[in-house]
């Protein structure tokens, strides 16, 4: 397998066979492919559009090479990690949703990193509220079990990514690596709310997660480009549940929520993102809380803590109103800081 031959095939708009893609990803992850070639391959795949097989093969390799977290009871384990790269610069909706889901007794294995293309990544905002990021796999497993939520700082678990990280940073555009992060949860969460930057990826990633053994997942893309369930208009959903995939569209009005432009959710800095996150967890009414209700409700549903998405939204509303979601945030801050003393 020569990367040059694979690149030539990609430029002809042809798919890379599964085994060759596995071999290529292992070579990239071990530093045996030059930065220039890695950049060319990632750009070529993006222009061709990555296939289900290519994505699944690459995710399989990343899963093999990742540090793993063992959570004793993982039936209700859920991740709310999205691809990012939507260019919308909203506050950290999936991070806020993670605390609400944890308050609803879902076990949240939140996976994420620093910002690549947004104003604040999940790691940036969690650090800003006082959470210690550098925890061991055992400590995070304990956090998930005892607090109900743990945060896995992606660079600490995907050491093999160090070879591709400089290329990804320098390119500054969405590539296969944006897609892989949410498919490679170190705790092996089989339930996911996964936001994507492109509508076409909803069905593709549902198929990839099916092949990778997921249990219940919702892959979502807002009509405004948001890699979340949006409140500004329709959201395209591909839902994987017990081996079946169903595709449909929802509107905020379906859940009794008012349609609002996403400009009110945009931030210019990590501190802006922190302030908006805390405002939601303080249950301040408005578009930020509404969009978290939609997304947290979906996370609660896929985690098996609600029989329907609508019920999940009502549970989310209750957990914000009671202060339980904010308590989860405070508990995680306390737990993570105990580890450093």
Curated annotation (Swiss-Prot):
Binds 2 magnesium ions per monomer. Disulfide bonds: none annotated. It catalyses: N-(5-phospho-beta-D-ribosyl)anthranilate + diphosphate = 5-phospho-alpha-D-ribose 1-diphosphate + anthranilate. Mg(2+) 1 binds at residues 94, 228. Transmembrane segments: none annotated. 5-phospho-alpha-D-ribose 1-diphosphate binds at residues 82, 85-86, 90, 92-95, 110-118, 122. GO terms for molecular function: anthranilate phosphoribosyltransferase activity; magnesium ion binding. Anthranilate 1 binds at residue 82. Signal peptide: none annotated. InterPro entries: Anthranilate_Pribosyl_Tfrase, Glycosyl_Trfase_fam3, Glycosyl_Trfase_fam3_N_dom, Glycosyl_Trfase_fam3_N_dom_sf, Nuc_phospho_transferase. Its cofactor is Mg(2+). Pathway: Amino-acid biosynthesis; L-tryptophan biosynthesis; L-tryptophan from chorismate: step 2/5. Catalyzes the transfer of the phosphoribosyl group of 5-phosphorylribose-1-pyrophosphate (PRPP) to anthranilate to yield N-(5'-phosphoribosyl)-anthranilate (PRA). NCBIfam families: trpD. PANTHER family: ANTHRANILATE PHOSPHORIBOSYLTRANSFERASE (PTHR43285:SF2). Homodimer. This is Anthranilate phosphoribosyltransferase. It comes from Nitrosomonas eutropha (strain DSM 101675 / C91 / Nm57). The lineage of its organism: Bacteria, Pseudomonadati, Pseudomonadota, Betaproteobacteria, Nitrosomonadales.
